[in-house]
Design a protein with these regions (language model features):
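Flexible mid-to-C-terminal extensions adjoining Fe-S/redox cofactors in radical SAM and related proteins
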Residues: 1-9, 29, 33, 272-273, ...
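Conserved alpha-helical substructure of the radical SAM core
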Residues: 1-121, 135, 139, 143, ...
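Radical SAM enzyme [4Fe-4S]-AdoMet core and its adjacent flexible, acidic
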Residues: 6, 14, 29, 34-44, ...
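Processing junctions and N-termini across compartments
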Residues: 13, 17-20, 251, 339, ...
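Non-transmembrane alpha-helical segments in soluble domains
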Residues: 53, 83-85, 150-153, 177, ...
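A residue-identity detector for tryptophan
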Residues: 75, 85, 108-109, 185, ...
């Protein structure tokens, strides 16, 4: 079992698959270009959230965070009403939200700060200044983002700036850290991407960025400074030397499931309860012909399809203690990927790689930020 319903502490919610950006390493689009054809464009309403989450569960949760695999939560029509409802049910609940910040009005952001209150935060993903932020956060408006962040902070909101490092912006890390402190952000994190990796787990040094018509516009490149590179990607070559092939490594590595440790689950915008966002990002888009995607979809079909995971039709308890979650956890004991060990689990939560843990470079917590 991945998690017992009675032990749940954390929930990641993707309220919508809508987003105004075109980030080249996001599964929502084709390398920064057009939206992938098979993605369902949908969102969860306040009424659906109320139906999905029993108040007894909300009252005992420690953290709910809105972080989309495919969408940005601020694009959801009911994001404020949903947060208001969660806060009413559990005043002590920590509520977080990850966004590029390039939508809504300053007035709306002031209201968001008031609704989140003392036990809430917003992570603004800002990867540079007016000259560089749009290189990765395509189709966003830097000046609007800063205005929105200022409005949120001015109204008392706890703001965190998360800076994803590439070659085109690595020279700005220290400057943006200082800028974030001046603006009133309570924390700054520079982050190393682990996504210079193909669906077949081949390391690439640069990634093409496409227009919506599919033409190459430019390339994203890894940082030159080793300090800003995700060491897990560098480690793959060593693992291949030790195990002959990366597939052999995946066959042998023990899996230490992060969501099992955190007692966490994931709710998708189409209402599905699944173990984590790292499986969710293999459901649609460019990776659907990968082994990881095929494995997960095969399991979904084995247990009766998406309908059996739909939290609008079945209780969270029924789903997390049901067949899919059991089959995923049972797969970890299989000897090889070909025998049913979940490849995606081995890549993300294999104990010898730890791509997620190795994303953080520097975390600055300012004096006024004493919660985290």
């Amino acid at each position: 079992m991945i998690v017992d319903y009675n032990d749940l502490e954390v929930c990641q919610i993707e309220l919508t698959t809508e987003c105004g950006a075109g980030c080249p390493q996001c599964p929502r689009n084709v390398h920064g270009g057009k939206t992938v054809d098979d993605l369902p464009i949908c969102e969860l309403s306040l009424d659906e959230i109320k139906k999905i989450f029993p108040t007894e569960l909300v009252k005992r949760l420690r953290l709910v965070f809105f972080c989309g695999t495919y969408g940005d939560p601020i694009w959801a029509r009911d994001v404020l009403p949903v947060i208001k409802w969660l806060r009413e049910v559990n005043p002590k609940l920590e509520i977080g939200l990850n966004t590029n910040g390039s939508a809504r009005t300053e007035k709306w952001w002031g209201e968001m700060a008031n609704v989140l209150g003392d036990n809430g935060y917003v992570v603004f993903s800002i990867d540079g200044d007016e000259e560089t932020n749009h290189i990765y956060r395509r189709y966003t408006d830097y000046n609007k983002i800063i205005r929105n962040a200022k409005a949120f902070i001015k109204s008392g909101g706890e703001a965190i700036l998360e800076f994803l490092v590439f070659r085109h912006n690595e020279h700005q890390v220290e400057d943006i850290e200082k800028f974030s402190k001046e603006l009133g952000f309570k924390r700054f994190t520079s982050k190393k991407t682990g996504r210079f990796l193909t669906k077949d787990h081949t390391i690439i040094q640069k990634q093409e960025v496409l227009s919506k018509e599919g033409e190459i516009e430019y390339y994203l490149e890894k940082p030159k400074n080793p300090e800003y590179r995700n060491i897990s990607l560098e480690k793959i070559d060593k693992l291949i030397e030790e195990h002959t092939t990366f597939d052999d490594y995946l066959n042998q590595v023990p899996i230490k499931c992060l969501v099992k440790q955190k007692k966490e689950l994931y709710l998708s915008a189409d209402g599905l309860i699944i173990p984590c966002g790292w499986l969710a990002d293999r459901m649609y888009g460019l990776h659907t012909d990968s082994k990881s995607s095929k494995q997960f979809w095969d399991l979904i079909h084995e247990v009766g399809g998406k309908d059996g995971l739909d939290a609008r039709k079945h209780s969270i308890k029924e789903i997390v203690e049901g067949k899919l979650f059991k089959k995923v956890s049972e797969s970890w004991t299989k000897k090889t990927i070909s025998e049913g060990k979940m490849e995606r689990c081995a890549v993300v939560c294999g104990q010898d790689l730890d791509i997620l843990k190795n994303q953080a470079v520097k975390i600055y917590r300012y004096e006024s930020y004493d919660k985290k």
